[in-house]
Amino acid sequence: MKAEILFPEVCNLYGDLQNIYYLKRCCPALEIIETDLHSKPRFLTEDVALVYMGSTTEQGLRLAADALRPYAADIAAKADAGQLILLTGNAPDVFSDAIESDSADTIEGLGILPGRVRYTMMKRHNSFFLGTFDGMEVVGFKSLFGFHYDAPERGGWFRITRGVGRTPESKLEGFCRGGLYATALIGPLLILNPPLCKW
């Protein structure tokens, strides 16, 4: 069984990569593939159980978007066919239509997830999160510069109990599309939520 980490050289903030290394400790037979920015993602041509991409810097977002853009249609098709893809932190922003910022040029996203992300760099949001999914509670942390706008209020991953969602007003957090699960929660998501990890 294989798990692929996309771009660990830049998508490595907040200890997000420990989500995958935790799985390796739970299942020593798991083979971890680390795909760099200059390589085609292996899950597009090989059997990979889980694809993971974590948080990165604003420059890292641009690099990741540029690296994945040639494969956007193939990634969307794989997700729709059930390929398990987990995106945490600001990684989902790359998969949106675009990332707009008050202090940088707009980054064209992959258009796999709906809506646009708007960053206000001097208004960082930090909070705890409590939500529900499939009968279980999910806890986590958020630290972000912006929110997802112009996305329909459906297709979320978690329902909010406390904290904020895609926008401060939304009751949904994250996105689901086929086998793609995306959340703005950062850090050891799977370690903090064993039932979610088992799911």
Describe each PLM feature range.
Residues 102-174:
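Pocket-forming structural segment of enzyme catalytic cores
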Residues 47-48, 81-83, 105-108, 136-138, ...:
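Short coil/turn connectors at secondary-structure junctions
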Residues 50-54, 86, 182-184:
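Structural motif
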Residues 166-199:
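A glycine-centered loop/beta-turn motif at secondary-structure junctions
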Residues 1-80, 191-198:
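N-terminal beta1-alpha1 cap of cysteine-dependent amidohydrolase-like domains
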Residues 34, 86-89, 142, 184:
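A structural signal for short, well-ordered beta-strand segments and their strand-loop junctions
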Residues 58-59, 92-94, 147-149, 189-191:
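Glycine-rich nucleotide phosphate-binding loop and flanking beta-alpha elements
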Residues 56-132:
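Cysteine-nucleophile active-site neighborhood
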